[in-house]
């Protein structure tokens, strides 16, 4: 539990009640912000786990000629959950962005605003990274599914080019494309079912990829525009570290030079005392004579 004593003390000792309230409310505002940051982090981590589960289901589906319907249902549920969570995250990130814009010339301190801007940029980058991984997994699954269709067609004696296969996929009607080989005794019902099943999988993927495109581009463009700000922060941190290290070295040199100068002063003083003593001795002897 966070220590609230400083806040309570500020409220008690401050004669201006309004000022005390502002301090507490401001603290509460940042507490709420950091709570929201943790929620977004958890949601991004949950999407990352879902993406790993999606990849596993993709592998299972690709390894079986006719995978169980349960696996495909689970895959659809994962896709829906990822999109729902992603839309929620995007909404929260946009809300933070709008809040920062409103407070740009408001009453919030520059420190608080920089913290919120930085956290927003970091979370946006993480979000885009995990959604990029999800998008790449879908594209890979599409290509591998397309390869399975092509191999099944080759088994029937029907050689297809990539352009022809893409034309079939875009038409959405595989039955027209393979109608001339259905009567061929060389094709098995299992092979035909797999071709149609893979085609349906690809059609669902096309829809999913289109739905994600707008969201992905929106966040990717934001991260690109905010990237320079994050880079500037990183450069400032590095420069600060370099400056501190340089200052340490200069301090060491100054101490070293100061020590040498102090040592020289003591030597000069000792020599001066010795000279004075010798002169005094000579003068004393001269007077004695």
Curated annotation (Swiss-Prot):
Question: Per UniProt, what is one Pfam family of this protein?
Answer: SNARE
Which UniProt keywords are given for this protein, alphabetically ordered?
Answer: Coiled coil, Membrane, Transmembrane, Transmembrane helix
Residues on the membrane's Cytoplasmic side span 1-265
Record's GO cellular component terms: cell surface; cell-cell junction; cytoplasmic vesicle; membrane raft
Query: Taxonomy-wise, where does this protein's organism fall, top ranks first?
Result: Eukaryota, Metazoa, Chordata, Craniata, Vertebrata
Task: Assign the protein's first listed, main location to one coarse class.
Answer: membrane
- Note whether Nucleotide-binding occurs among the keywords: no
Q: Which InterPro entries match?
A: SNARE (IPR010989), STX2_SNARE (IPR028671), Syntaxin (IPR045242), Syntaxin/epimorphin_CS (IPR006012), Syntaxin_N (IPR006011), T_SNARE_dom (IPR000727)
Q: How does it assemble?
A: Interacts with SYT6 and SYT8; the interaction is Ca(2+)-dependent.
The UniProt function text for this chain reads: Essential for epithelial morphogenesis. May mediate Ca(2+)-regulation of exocytosis acrosomal reaction in sperm.
Topology term for the membrane: Single-pass type IV membrane protein
Q: Where is the t-SNARE coiled-coil homology domain?
A: 192-254
Protein name in UniProt: Syntaxin-2
Q: Which residues form the signal peptide?
A: none
Entry's family note = Belongs to the syntaxin family.
Q: Give the GO biological process terms.
A: acrosome reaction; cell differentiation; embryo implantation; intracellular protein transport; vesicle-mediated transport
- One GO MF term: calcium-dependent protein binding
User: Species name for this entry?
Assistant: Mus musculus
This protein's gene is called Stx2
Q: Where are the bilayer-spanning segments?
A: 266-289
Subcellular location field: Membrane
């Amino acid at each position: 539990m966070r220590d609230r004593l400083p806040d309570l003390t500020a409220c008690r000792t401050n004669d201006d009640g309004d000022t005390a309230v502002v301090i507490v409310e401001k603290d509460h505002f940042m507490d709420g912000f950091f709570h929201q940051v943790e929620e977004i982090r958890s949601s991004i981590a949950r999407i990352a786990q879902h993406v790993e589960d999606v990849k596993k289901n993709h592998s299972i589906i690709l390894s079986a000629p006719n995978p169980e319907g349960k696996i495909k249902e689970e895959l659809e549920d994962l896709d829906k959950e990822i999109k729902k969570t992603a839309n929620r995250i995007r909404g929260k990130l946009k809300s933070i962005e709008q809040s920062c814009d409103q407070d740009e010339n408001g009453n919030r301190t520059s420190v608080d605003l920089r913290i919120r801007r930085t956290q927003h940029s970091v979370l946006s980058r993480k979000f885009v990274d995990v959604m990029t991984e999800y998008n790449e997994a879908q594209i890979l699954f599409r290509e591998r599914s397309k390869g399975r269709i092509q191999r099944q067609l080759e088994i029937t004696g029907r050689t297809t080019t990539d352009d022809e296969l893409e034309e079939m996929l875009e038409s959405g009607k595989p039955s027209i494309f393979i109608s001339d080989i259905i009567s061929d005794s060389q094709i098995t019902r299992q092979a035909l079912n797999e071709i149609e099943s893979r085609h349906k999988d690809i059609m669902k993927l096309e829809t999913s990829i289109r739905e994600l495109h707008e969201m992905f581009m929106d966040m990717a463009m934001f991260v690109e525009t905010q990237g320079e700000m994050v880079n500037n922060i990183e450069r400032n941190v590095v420069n600060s570290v370099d400056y501190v290290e340089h200052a340490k070295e200069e301090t060491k040199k100054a101490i070293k030079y100061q020590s040498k100068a102090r040592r020289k002063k003591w030597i000069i003083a000792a020599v001066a005392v010795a000279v004075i003593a010798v002169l005094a001795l000579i003068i004393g002897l001269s007077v004695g004579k």
